Amino acid sequence: MSWVQLRGHRFHFIQASFDAESNEAVQVIHITDLVRVWSCTCSRNQIVNQAESERCPIDPFQTFETLVDVLAEVLVNVSSESRIQLRGSNDEGSLKIFCTSKIAKDIFLEWNWTLWLTPPETIAKMVWFPLINHHLFESETDTSPGSLMSIIRDQKSLLNDKTWFKEALNERSSSSNPSTPRKRSAFADIISPKRPRTRYDFV
């Protein structure tokens, strides 16, 4: 499984697998902000119970495989038109995904997942080590659009292009006014702040 950018969320990436034939791990979902990882595993019974309680328009008994396929489509497919929202808990111990998708005329599918924060070492095991391995041993052309590696390469290309630096430098030069007298800098105030004169009254 590869990490792909979560649709509509610039700094969050998702890794997910869906297997309608499994009973215990039909859905395995991970989300990262590149600092932490949240995860959840959903069994067949959990999905069926949630579909019943939320009055899902797709029958979880007769068309369970279809339901799983649709959930995978709306959550992972970068070209899907579904809307995804993230909501974190106050203690950041859990993360909720809310997904809304139009599956037919005037028929909408609404679904949510609750992911739980994993131990700190998970970020290295699931994100950084695979990225290093990919960089060292795999072809640079072997990346799909929207994947974490492709986004990193795009940003690297942007940094290597010096045009942005020259434009920023020219903009800063044009905005400065050489006739303006230099003032005491904030940094100078920090290291040697101005002090008011102390008056001494002698008796």
From Swiss-Prot:
Q: Which GO terms describe its molecular function?
A: DNA binding
Q: Name one GO cellular component term.
A: DNA ligase IV complex
Knocked-out gene: effects: Spores sensitive to ionizing radiation.
- Principal localisation: nucleus
Name the CDD domains for this protein. HD_XLF_N
Q: Which InterPro entries match?
A: XLF-like_CC, XLF-like_N, XRCC4-like_N_sf
Q: Which GO terms describe its biological process?
A: double-strand break repair; double-strand break repair via classical nonhomologous end joining; double-strand break repair via nonhomologous end joining
| Compartments where found | Nucleus
Show the Pfam families listed in the entry: XLF, XLF_CC
Q: Which UniProt keywords apply?
A: DNA damage, DNA repair, Nucleus
Family named by the database record: Belongs to the XRCC4-XLF family. XLF subfamily.
Tell me, in a sentence or two, what this protein's role is: Involved in double-strand break repair via non-homologous end joining (NHEJ); the repair of a double-strand break in DNA in which the two broken ends are rejoined with little or no sequence complementarity. Has a role in meiosis.
| Record-given protein name | Xrcc4-like factor 1
| Chain's gene name | xlf1
